[in-house]
Design a protein with these regions (language model features):
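A residue-level marker of the well-folded mature domains of exported/periplasmic proteins
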Residues: 1-199
Length: 199
């Protein structure tokens, strides 16, 4: 049995949250290695942003790696200094560098001026803690797109219990059957309302 996740659906919601949060009308997407799976994250994110405001600029860059954290840091640095204030990363270990860059940058800013990162595959909020220049304990993870692997395991074991083990089938998990989701993390009430509506 194999499972596929409709990552573009949770990425779309991340795009809505980003578009409702950006102060610069400029956001970014960093992918690992271009493939159908990662492109689905990118396109979903872009569509979500566009649904809120088609004039928001979305920078897109691929690292050509899933492990090069240094590359992630360099790309994030260029995007942030180019005016993007939120980056969604779907890039494995490359994403670690994006978090590092956001932390370094945010420690030089007042809390109100922080830049954001959107987490991927699991809730990454705990990786976004920092102390701002004006001495505030804060967090820069706006939201996280989730693969709800636990729900999939539950679903397959329930099917098995009912003698309906889906051997050889490809099971598709999306927002409707709770296979993917968006963790709210630090999304504002207004932005979260837009996410709920977009669902």
């Amino acid at each position: 049995v194999s499972a596929t996740f409709a990552d573009q659906e949770s990425a779309y919601l991340a795009g809505v949250a980003a578009a409702k949060t950006t102060k610069t009308d400029h956001v970014g997407f960093i992918g690992g290695i271009a493939s159908d799976i990662i492109t689905a994250f990118q396109v979903g994110f872009q569509e979500g942003v566009k649904s809120v405001n088609p004039n928001i600029k979305v920078d897109v860059q691929y690292a050509g790696s899933f492990s090069d954290a240094g590359k992630g840091k360099t790309i994030a640095s260029a995007m942030y200094s180019g005016g993007a204030d939120i980056i969604y990363q779907a890039a494995g270990g490359v994403g670690t560098g994006v978090f590092t860059e956001a932390r370094v940058l945010n420690e030089t800013k007042n809390e109100a001026d922080k830049v954001w990162v959107i987490g991927v595959d699991r809730d990454q909020e705990s990786e976004g803690d920092f102390k701002s220049k004006d001495g505030k304990e804060s967090n820069f993870v706006l939201a996280s797109t989730l693969k709800e692997v636990g729900n999939v395991v539950k679903d397959v074991s329930n099917k098995t219990k009912d003698n309906k083990f889906p051997g050889g089938e490809i099971l598709k998990y999306d927002l409707k059957n709770s296979g993917v989701a968006l963790a709210r993390n630090n999304t504002s009430d207004e932005a979260w309302k837009a996410v709920e509506t977009a669902k």
